[in-house]
Swiss-Prot record:
This is DNA primase. It catalyses: ssDNA + n NTP = ssDNA/pppN(pN)n-1 hybrid + (n-1) diphosphate. Monomer. Interacts with DnaB. Contains an N-terminal zinc-binding domain, a central core domain that contains the primase activity, and a C-terminal DnaB-binding domain. Disulfide bonds: none annotated. Belongs to the DnaG primase family. The gene is dnaG.
Amino acid sequence: MVGEYVRLTPAGKGRLKGLCPFHKEKTPSFQVDTEKGYYHCFGCKASGDVFGFVQQMEHLSFGDALRKLADRAGIQIDAKYGEKVSRDLYEVNAFALDYFRSHLPGPALDYLRGRGLSDETIAAFELGYAPDGWDGLLKLARTKGVSEKQLLEAGLLTENPENGRVYDRFRGRVMFPIRDHLGRLVGFGGRVLDDSKPKYLNTPETAAFKKGELLYGLDKARSGLGGGAELVVVEGYMDVISMHQHGFTGAVASLGTALTAEHAQLLERLGAQSIVLMFDQDGAGLKATLAGLDQVIGAKFRVRATSVPSGKDPADALLAGDDAGIREALAGGLDEVKYRVQAATEKYGVDTNEGKRRVLMELLPRMQNLDPLDAIAQDMRGAACELLGIRPEALLDWITSKAKRRTLTDTHLAGMSQSSGEEEHELALLRQLLVDPSLLAKLDGSLPWRNEAVRKVMLAAQGARSPDDILDIFRGQPEEQLLIRLMFEGRDSGSLSRASSQEYEQKVTTYAAHAVDDIQVTLNIDALKTEVDLLKKQLLSTPPAEQLALLSQIQELQRAIEAEKRARRGS
């Protein structure tokens, strides 16, 4: 058994030696005792029996190693070590594979060659063809002593429920044999040569074929896991085969499903250290990627997500000679946080409050876990705060409150936001108006409010005589909490003496009046600066002949800014 993995030479009675497969060395220090059935390396100290050797070489559990050795020896093991699968089920699949491979020459072979596959690759992946007839496999089985029951159990026949007649399940299809991670032939996938539907057809669920637990190509790709090779999960059989042919030998594919929790558990058990999800850029591909990311939450391996830059699937990209595009996609894969944030941003945008709301709700399921050990959730919250300009403490308050179950309003967002300088000035102005609403009459009605909550209050507060009048307007609405906070802040200026209640009220009102004047000047300056910035950007794309007029406008605005500043200093 060891000799299948290590080149061994005699080293004395009952002993063989070779280069250790578990560490790099130039002089053989690995020995096998053929009489006792043990191995030992004098270099890295690895040792054990045949089961331990297979476990370590193949990254298998004891049960999987036992099944592999039992299959090799032709022994059927007790069901407690694994699923109860009759050995002849695998043999029936092998019989069908021989039948399919014998019918490959012809249109099916031409199709595969046309997809860029070499004859060597076609042979390595054991591709075949199911003839377009109703009972070709069934007729052959009858001559070879394979029963209808066995074919039905293997999912190779379909029974008509009305008349009980059986016929071949796979007809007129290129056949892809599907092996589990131990290399056992558990089923097939079939693809039509034309555009008829369904394009793909798999073996139905059987004792051996569990679609949610299988990854096509894993029997070949797993050999690199011991050296830390990265697995690349793609969408289809042809993607896997083309990737392997072009040297991307870590490619595997799920069988028409997104990555599942069972897949994640299997990959962990096999010692996977890193995987990349490389699905198509369409809506289905995005959905499969996000679903796959959901299933590997908490996995011990690193997960990234990417897609081919050209928008093609890997097989078509490689057929077009775009090996570089595949390498670029693999090199540029995004971690879970960056991928989710990018996907949500591209889907909804963050230029509007509606877009921000949708992005936040999209990210909520993954960032609401407050377990300190969930680093991804923490990073997701940090990314959301940075992207949307949200205060971290405000985001946590929202996540832990019932508010997250409601639709986010503009005011919710405003309350969570890290306000810009202009918005801070607007909130400061509103703070003072809550001290004395009559000061509202002093405001320039042309001011463009940036903060949505401020805009709503300013419009609704016209004619209010007291702060209570304003609060009554927004009683029970999202703006109420913001107004209460600002009202307390406006009256607690800190620098005002509270010698007497009457004197305090006079000082607060006087302070508020001066503050309104000052803040209004600041807002005017902010608005002028915004206009200057827009004109400067416009200047970069303006023909030289038209730049003089823009420069003149910029100079005039800058003079207006200086005039506002002088007015403030003189007041």
